[in-house]
């Protein structure tokens, strides 16, 4: 929520929300959603998100869309999620653009349309949203939506990986391991696998295990070869 107003106290924010301030209403919704300063209450969160969203606040529109997407505080309804996410996406909210892209990719709440998914992922990725950067990287790596381009895949994986997106760190490690889109470099591969593994990424943990097992086997083979070498 950059470039957003702040209030000195929770009560001042709540009063501003009651008096109709859209940003305060959005913040109050977040407080109810997360249980910050109040008891967690998803229905109250939705109430305040809706009041703010109806005043065209893009952050609240995104939150409301995600509530419909997940069924938190409202019945899950993908078409309603798409409606609010589009409102926010059209105002350049990167989280909304990413989530709208996901709906187009999966065909939930909107007709499945990979070109639209690509469009919204790119909009979001260019605004620095890591999950969108990762998905855009996947599109370029697989070549199913855009022409396959490993260099572009690496570019977007790296952008997301540097923001601690674990799947992107894992995929960037794989690119270094295999030399796809980047010069092969096992040390770099291990570095990114470790960063992803520390966040609990199972694929990275598996790849790291394979790497160390292979390294150990190579070391043992080298020792045995040295033993057999005539002196």
Q: What are the residue ranges of the model-derived segments?
A:
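Terminal, low-structured helical/coil segments at or just beyond the last alpha-helical repeat
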Residues: 2-8, 16, 207-231
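Conserved structural position within tetratricopeptide repeats
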Residues: 15-18, 47-54, 86-90, 119-126, ...
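Short helix-capping/linker turns of helical repeat alpha-solenoids
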Residues: 18-21, 34-36, 41, 55-57, ...
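Hydrophobic face of amphipathic alpha-helices that form TPR/SEL1-like repeat modules
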Residues: 27-34, 63-70, 99-106, 135-142, ...
């Amino acid at each position: 929520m950059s470039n957003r107003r702040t209030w000195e106290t929770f009560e001042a924010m709540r009063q501003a929300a009651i008096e109709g301030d859209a940003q305060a209403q959005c913040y109050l919704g977040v407080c109810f959603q997360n249980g910050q300063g109040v008891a967690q209450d998803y229905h109250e969160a939705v109430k305040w998100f809706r009041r703010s969203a109806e005043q065209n606040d893009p952050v609240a529109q995104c939150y409301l869309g995600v509530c419909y997407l997940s069924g938190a505080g409202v019945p899950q309804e993908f078409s309603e999620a798409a409606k609010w996410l589009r409102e926010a996406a059209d105002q350049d909210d990167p989280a909304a653009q990413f989530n709208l892209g996901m709906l187009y990719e999966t065909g939930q709440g909107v007709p499945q349309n990979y070109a639209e998914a690509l469009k919204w992922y790119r909009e979001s990725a260019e605004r620095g949203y890591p999950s969108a950067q990762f998905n855009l990287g996947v599109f370029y790596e697989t070549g199913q939506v855009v022409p396959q381009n490993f260099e572009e895949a690496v570019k977007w994986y790296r952008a997301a990986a540097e923001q601690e997106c674990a799947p992107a760190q894992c995929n960037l490690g794989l690119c270094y391991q295999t030399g796809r889109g980047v010069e092969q470099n096992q040390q770099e591969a291990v570095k990114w696998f470790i960063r992803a593994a520390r966040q609990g990424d199972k694929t990275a943990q598996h790849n790291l295990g394979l790497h160390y097992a292979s390294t150990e086997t190579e070391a043992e083979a080298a020792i045995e070869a040295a033993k057999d070498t005539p002196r």
